[in-house]
Amino acid sequence: MSLTLILIRHAKSDWADPGQPDHARPLAPRGRRDAPRMGAWLARGGHLPELVLCSDAARTRETLALMQPEWPTTPEIRHAPALYAAPPRKLRGALEGMGARSIALVAHNPGIGQLAADLAAEAPAHPRFADYPTCAVTVLKFEAKDWSSISKGHVAAFAIPADL
């Protein structure tokens, strides 16, 4: 069975209020511009999730809220506190037991970028894949019976807002 994993780092966040808790930081104007563009890019490529697992931080929720209207279908959305600042192991663990064949994870660096690198059978030639900038998106394809049995996957697509 073919499984698709879409790894999305939140869009550029706002650092204007130094006293604001990290969890509550909203998107910066650039992030609010980039997120819909990346959502449209996913839709044009036919990379649409059935399920979205999203960190409950303000900037990940806002990124998803701006991407999702660009998609022709509405996925099930679950906001998960455990995905906030999660390491790759925890992000990957969130997939286990999920029945959806196409899942998007919306999370934070360094975890989301490390997970993309860990799961890619071959990293894309893109010069920004290694540092996984804000609003970077990787689409990985796996031939596996379920999420607990995925190993290395094929990178079907990778982009950052500057590419569009």
Identify the residue ranges that each predicted region occupies.
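Active-site-proximal alpha-helix that buttresses catalytic centers in soluble enzyme cores
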Residues: 2-82, 124, 132-133
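Short glycine-/acidic-enriched loop or helix-start segments at secondary-structure transitions
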Residues: 17, 63-64, 89, 114-117
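Short phosphate-binding loop-to-helix
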Residues: 82-99
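Domain-level recognition of soluble alpha/beta enzyme cores
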Residues: 123-154, 158
